[in-house]
Amino acid sequence: MSTSPNKNPQTSAADQYTKPPTDDPFAHEQEGFHKGLGARQLQMIAIGSAIGTGLFLGTGSRLQDAGPMLAVIYAVIGFFGYLILRALGELILHRPSSGSFVSYTREFYGEKAAFVSGWLYWLNWAMTAVADATAIAIYISWFGRYNQFFADIPQWLSAFIVVIVTVALNLISVKLFGELEFWFALIKILALLSFMAVGIWHLVFGEPINGVTPGLSLIAANDGFFPNGILPALIVVQGVVFAYAGIELVGTTSGETKNVEKVIPRAINTVIWRIAIFYVGSVVLLCLLMPYTAYKDAESPFVTFFDAIGIDGTAPIMQLVVITAAASSLNAGLYSTGRILHSMGVAGSAPKFTTKVSRSGVPVAGILLTGVIGLFGVVLNFFVPEQAFEVVLNIASVGTMASWAAIAMSHQKYLKLVGEGKYKRPNYRAPGGRFSDWAVMVFLAVVLVLMALDYPVGTYTLASLLLVIPLLIIGWYTVRDRVNEIARVREGYTGSVPVIAARPVVKKLVPEPRTHIDLGELDAEDEDKPKGN
C-alpha cells in the first residue's frame, strides 16, 4: 500500500511520477516547454543547423588528406544523412518530442537502450561544444596577422569566453534561441552563396588565382582524384560524418514547434538541396578553384580562397562568418543536450536536477551541465592546443553515428509495429522503409571500420570506447531501479526487464487522471498482464 507523499517525505521515484491526463504515455517529457519556435525559425534551423565547424574548418585538413575525392565522400554521406532524416521525420509525425530519438528509443526498445543512446548523444554534443569552442579560438587567433592583440590572446582564454557567453544566451528562452539560430543560419547561407558566386565567376571566366587558372586541369595536374591513395581518402569519412552532425536537430525542436504536421515535412524536404548545394557544391568548387595542397589544417578553406584572390577585406569578413558558424553550432548543441537530458531526467536515466525547467521553458540544469563539459575544452586547449580540435572531432563522430543508429533502429521497430497493426503510418513516410534502415546500419558499420584504420587518432578514439562502455554499464546499474520504478506507471512502455511491457496501441482508453499512482494497486493488476519480451 502506498503512502501519500505528504505523510512520508521519503517517497519513491514512481510515487512522485505524475501520470499525464492524456493518451500519450510520454507527454510527461514535454511538461514545462513552450511552443516558441515558428515555421520561419525551423526552416532556417533545418537548412543551417549542420553548417558548422565540420564544413568551415574541418574541410581544409580533409582536402589535404583526400584531395578532390572529398566531394564524392560528402555526397555519399549526405545521401545516408538524408535517409536518416526522413526516418526521423516519420517518427516526429508519429509523436513530436523534445526528447527526439532518445524518446523514440525508449518507446520502442525500452529504458536501457534509451539510457545508452541518450548519454552517447550527450557525449557527442558535449564534445562538439569543445570542438566549436576550440575552432572559435583558432579563428580569433587568425586575426593576429592584422593586430597583435588577437595574437596575444591565449587559445584557452578565447574558448572559455565563448562557452560562458553562449551558455548565458541559451538560458534566456527558446524564442531567443530560435532568433539567434535564424540569423546565424542566414549569415552562413549568404556567406556560402557569396563564395559560390565569386568562385563560379573565377571558374567561368578563367580568372587566375595565385597565378594558376582554375578548372578540371587543376585536378589532373595534382595527381587526380586520389592524390594520396584510396585508403587516405576513405578514412576521412569520420570527419565528414562530424560535418553532418546536427541534421537531427529538427527532431529536438519538434517538441517546441507550432504546426508540426506542416512545418516538419517542409523543413526536412529542403535538406537534400542543402546537401547538394552547400556541401557537395562548395567542396567541388574548392577543388576546382585551387590545388588541394593550398588548403591548410588550422584555417577555413573559404578564408584561404578569399585570401588568395586578394580582394581587400573579404578574407576577414569570411573569417567572421566562420566564427558565426561555430557559435551557431555551439548554440544548437547546448539547446539540444538540454532537452535530451530533460527527457532522460524525467525517465530517471539522468540526474533528477536535469528536469528543472525555468519559467521561460528552458531546461536550465541540462544546459549548465553541458556547459561545464564545454569548459573541459578550455583545459584541452591549454595543454594541447594543436591537437584539441581533431581529438574531440573523432569522439563526437562516434556519438553522431550512435545517434543515427538509434534513429534507424527506432524507425525499423516502428515499422514492425505498424505491420502488426499497432500504429498507422503518417502520410509523410521515409523512402525505402526498413530496407533504408538496414542500409544505414551497414553504412555506419563500414564507417567504424574505416575509423579504426585511421591510426593513431581514429584507432585511439575507438579504443576509448573500452572506457566509455564500462562507464555506461556502471551508470545503468546505478539508475536502473529508479528508471524501472518510474517506467512501471507509464502506459505503453516497451522495456524488456524487469517491468511490465504492454505494447503500445493506436488508441487506448485512459482512466480518469489521478495525481499519483498506487504502486501496490499496479502490482496486483500486473499479474494479469502479459510480460514484455
Regions found by a protein language model. Give the residues of each.
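Hydrophobic, membrane-embedded alpha-helices of multi-pass small-molecule transporters
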Residues: 37-56, 61, 162-165, 219-280, ...
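C-terminal membrane-solvent junction of multi-pass transporters and transport-like membrane proteins
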Residues: 184, 353-364, 404-455, 491-494
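A generic transmembrane alpha-helix motif of multi-pass inner-membrane proteins
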Residues: 195, 203, 391, 395-403, ...
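Hydrophobic alpha-helical segments and their helix-loop junctions in multi-pass secondary transporters
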Residues: 187-221, 284-289, 404-421, 479-484
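Extracellular loop-to-transmembrane helix junctions
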Residues: 33-37, 47, 57-158, 271-276, ...
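TM-loop-TM module centered on a large, flexible mid-protein loop between adjacent transmembrane helices
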Residues: 103-105, 110, 142-147, 217-223, ...
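Membrane-interface loop-to-helix entry segments
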Residues: 154-213, 268-272, 393-406, 436-439, ...
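Membrane-interface "cap" regions at the ends of multi-pass membrane proteins
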Residues: 1-60, 64-69, 82, 86, ...
